[in-house]
Amino acid sequence: EVYPDAQLGDQQQTLEQCTMDALDMTLVANSIIETYVPDFAILGTPYVYDSIEHQQKVFESSKLDDLFATTRDHGFVVLSAYSLGARNLYTRDKAVTTPEELAMKIRVMGSDTCIAMMNAMGGVGVAMAQGDVYSAIQTGTLDGAENNIITYVDLVQYEVAPYYNRTGHLMIPDELCINAKVFDSMSAEDQEALKKCASESIDYMFNLCAELRSDYEAKAAEKGVIFSDADVPAFQALCQDLINDVANRTDMTKAVYEAIVSER
């Protein structure tokens, strides 16, 4: 049985249920797993992937297997990773194309890496529940937020932040997780079949999301969204110290970073 649209709770809650044997499988953002295994921060580091094609190559390789195995101590196993595409800035009052223009309060996901990233880029990172973002931008508590085009349109946040600025700063993965006891209860043949299906689903999901991004950009344009191309190298340069910091935190993050670079 599949329960979409947060019927069983938000992502933090569903992963908790998965670790407590109350839920067999769940799909959650990398930042949620990062709260259990901090080394996962390397997968959500700004500008760590050169392109969506590069990210897909990394996810389809076996080079993340050692990192994925570290979640077992917390009661779940990561089977595969996907991506909705690059996250970009969107703002309420004006376009942002350079770091100098980003002296704004921007909603980010609630991880230390994401907050540090936004601060490094020139803004002020504010962690906030997604359900509060629309009204916070509307009232001026926030100047904007950041997300992929699909989520931006689905949440109709273009109504309060019509400037969509292509910074491409993050490609946060979503990971498919299974309860460790459930996985271990399966026969070896069934385990291999499940892992094979999970691996094959990566290409399907990347292709599907590419089609969705194209459709959603068209929808956004119809709604009057103003697209701007940002000075990506300038933002990337400001994030380099953060990239180096995350990459060199542990032997695992260093190995994963080198594996990501090797797929470029």
Residue ranges and their predicted role:
Residues 1-54, 63, 71-264:
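N-terminal secretory/targeting leader peptides
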Residues 68:
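Conserved glycine-rich "GG(E/T)P / GGGxP" loop and the immediately following alpha-helix
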